[in-house]
Swiss-Prot record:
Gene this chain is encoded by: tdk
Protein name: Thymidine kinase
Signal peptide: none
One MF term in the entry's GO annotations: ATP binding
Subunit structure: Homotetramer.
Catalysis performed (reactions): thymidine + ATP = dTMP + ADP + H(+)
Keyword Repressor: no
Keyword presence, Zinc: yes
Residues that bind Zn(2+): C145, C148, C183, H186
Matches recorded under PANTHER family: THYMIDINE KINASE (PTHR11441), THYMIDINE KINASE, CYTOSOLIC (PTHR11441:SF0)
A Pfam family reported for this protein in Swiss-Prot or TrEMBL: TK
Length: 191
């Protein structure tokens, strides 16, 4: 997977909530740090669930991160020599994140992005599908369905324990109190 490239590349880690996306991003970042590579990690300002200045996985692993409001701010922070640029919760960025990641890869960086591939309705969650298309490596992770234990590819949003409706707002930052991993069979989105 980590062949030597003369230019940079993009790695996209995706899947449903609770599938281990942030955990995998943190693992790859730590491997880079162990190899004495220079790493910088970014997260969107909207993601304030666990920490404003860290990427934190659901099981508590964390790595220091720069909090940004707009994808263009990433380019402003990447001024010194870095080897790895990691971006978590990429689905919360504007669609310009695709161009930012592409530009960084073309400048020779290893770019790792992690985010949801589908929203709570089971609809592709832009800009992640486009990032998947331009990535050299795509890792799609699955969680375990909270109803039956089957592999989970969907994220179920719950409002007071009841499935959210299709026309509810797409973005609602939350964790276990609002979302569950579900398989295709047990994913419910009332119209």
């Amino acid at each position: 997977m980590y062949e030597h490239y003369h230019s940079g590349w993009i790695e996209c880690v995706t899947g449903s909530m609770f599938s281990g996306k942030s955990e995998e991003l943190i693992r790859r970042v730590r491997r880079g740090l162990f190899a004495k590579q220079k790493v910088i990690v970014f997260k969107p300002s909207i993601d304030d669930r666990y920490s404003e200045l860290e990427v934190v996985s659901h099981n508590g692993n964390k790595v220091e991160a720069v909090n940004v409001h707009h994808s263009s701010e990433i380019l402003e922070h990447v001024k010194e020599a870095h080897d790895i640029i990691a971006i978590d919760e990429v689905q919360f960025f504007d669609n310009d994140i695709v161009g930012v990641a592409t530009q960084l890869a073309e400048e020779g960086y290893r770019v790792i992005v992690a985010g949801l591939d589908m929203d709570f309705r089971g609809v592709p969650f832009e800009p992640v599908p486009e990032l998947m298309a331009v990535s050299e490596h795509v890792t799609k992770l699955q969680a375990v369905c909270s109803v039956c234990g089957a592999p989970s590819s969907r994220t179920q949003r719950l409002i007071d324990g009841v499935p959210a409706k299709f026309d509810d707002p797409i973005i609602l930052v939350g964790a276990k109190e609002s979302y569950e991993p579900r398989c295709r069979e047990h994913h419910v989105v009332p119209k």
